[in-house]
Swiss-Prot record:
Homodimerizes. Residues 1-19 form the signal peptide. Phosphorylated. Cleaved by host furin. This is External core antigen. The keyword Repeat applies. It comes from Hepatitis B virus genotype A2 (isolate Japan/11D11HCCW/1998). Keywords: Disulfide bond, Host nucleus, Host-virus interaction, Repeat, Secreted, Signal, Viral immunoevasion.
Amino acid sequence: MQLFHLCLIISCTCPTVQASKLCLGWLWGMDIDPYKEFGATVELLSFLPSDFFPSVRDLLDTASALYREALESPEHCSPHHTALRQAILCWVELMTLATWVGNNLQDPASRDLVVNYVNTNMGLKIRQLLWFHISCLTFGRETVLEYLVSFGVWIRTPPAYRPPNAPILSTLPETTVVRRRDRGRSPRRRTPSPRRRRSQSPRRRRSQSRESQC
């Protein structure tokens, strides 16, 4: 199995630092968390059960349908696009290596061990990575982080004291917007009086003009 790890690192041609984190951190037990720079952690993702994440094929189809142009672009779009590219490339290399091992390893038991290891361990990690970055691009990073925290609280709460259904990611943005709107404004400010509009100073009008250009 150590030989398999070494071959995997050598064959993984992802060119950036994030890819090195993915391969080296997970395979050699280094304390490197590929989610830290995005405000999450491996532990936070681990609250989600393994069957929560779609298959790699479904996630790749989703990434291609939604973000193919950006992923194929030579431009730097966002850190999430970059991490998504690297996760896809690492999965391609994993599949290539697994196919090669399956075709060249004579011992059936060893061959099954390699295939199962890739599908079970690395497959889950790739599914988590793909889901996280696709979700951040689709719903926004803050929404995804809020969802992970909400799910973690829900799953750790005894069944007798929690709602019957887990939080749903697609319903969080609407809730978040309403919450921020309620916190940020009062009804009085929403409808200023006519006298207030007439008494605006030139300085205030200039600042509003600048804001409207953003």
